């Protein structure tokens, strides 16, 4: 058929879940050579007949974003050009805007945003607290080696509590009085024998988990008044805290740890595996083998999928629920060097961000494996950590001694819905 060469026409149905942008459900004849640009012109012409303003859309054809000509996309999917093709369109997620550059004295290896605050960890052994408007609030010494990870335990108008981990083999629990801007180290957590590279706080904020270069996964109490008995009394009095549980199973460094729920942990490792741990059973529930060292891994509570960052420039998508969990659901191409860090959006089901040794952050839709939605530029050296915990801000730290803050501008459609 001529359409296969991009010269003929294809019958399509245009569908959307965003009802305020719906067009009549009738077949439309369009050129097989169309791309997203031409489809946007065609669709907006239909919508303008309804009095709508011009809108940028992305187009899903058989569950994947169209990133070239329609005829090439159909051929790649082995879809018959004789059939009527259903194309789903969605309002394009707007490009995040660069907002701030927070200058530090050394590499920024850890970032975590919550509310109006940004917590950062540096290679000069310090932790820093900033506002999301770029004002520096506090520099916190205490560790004796570079910081590797940070996470908030709790945060309200009066107090903030957080945990930091370091190459000095410890985790530290901190209490910050926001009014007086004073911070105290509540406990030093000792038990790892190498650098503590990852940390995650439980959903109820009563515990936290750490992953280390010593291959061990450890669980700790995060409570201020942690009851200790017998021989551990002296440790309590000195402010030293010991692990509640140690889980062995990885063969190399644990680079990522995350709570999937209150009793389940996800870890990623340089040993090429993802492991899902059942804390009630104190053992491994699921293991996913990959073909590369995992530098970071993140689980989405919205879509239940895991995305990984690896040494071969690619990001990969896995489904831990299937018997074929080790089968890669998708591979995302776009970075030009090691991908160091990755995180799902906490509010947008299909979106995630990544940071790489190519000095770039990228914003992805998991349905678009061939190209990211946007490049988030600004870093002058490799990106070491990225965070999208606060839906309004994408925050990244790098070897250029800066934190870059990008404001996420979600598309506003409320005015359309009320018309």
From Swiss-Prot:
WD repeats lie at residues 103-141, 142-184, 191-230, 249-287, 289-328, 334-374, 378-416. The keyword Iron does not apply. Keywords: Nucleus, Repeat, Ribosome biogenesis, rRNA processing, WD repeat. It is found in: Nucleus, Nucleolus; Nucleus, Nucleoplasm. Residues 10-91 are annotated as: Ubiquitin-like (UBL) domain. GO terms for biological process: maturation of 5.8S rRNA from tricistronic rRNA transcript (SSU-rRNA, 5.8S rRNA, LSU-rRNA); maturation of LSU-rRNA from tricistronic rRNA transcript (SSU-rRNA, 5.8S rRNA, LSU-rRNA). InterPro entries: G-protein_beta_WD-40_rep, NLE, WD40/YVTN_repeat-like_dom_sf, WD40_repeat_CS, WD40_repeat_dom_sf, WD40_rpt, WDR12/Ytm1. GO terms for molecular function: ribonucleoprotein complex binding. The keyword rRNA processing applies. Its main location: nucleus. One of its GO terms (cellular component) is preribosome, large subunit precursor. Pfam families: NLE, WD40. Required for maturation of ribosomal RNAs and formation of the large ribosomal subunit. HAMAP family: WDR12 (MF_03029). Belongs to the WD repeat WDR12/YTM1 family. This is Ribosome biogenesis protein WDR12 homolog. It comes from Drosophila grimshawi (Hawaiian fruit fly).
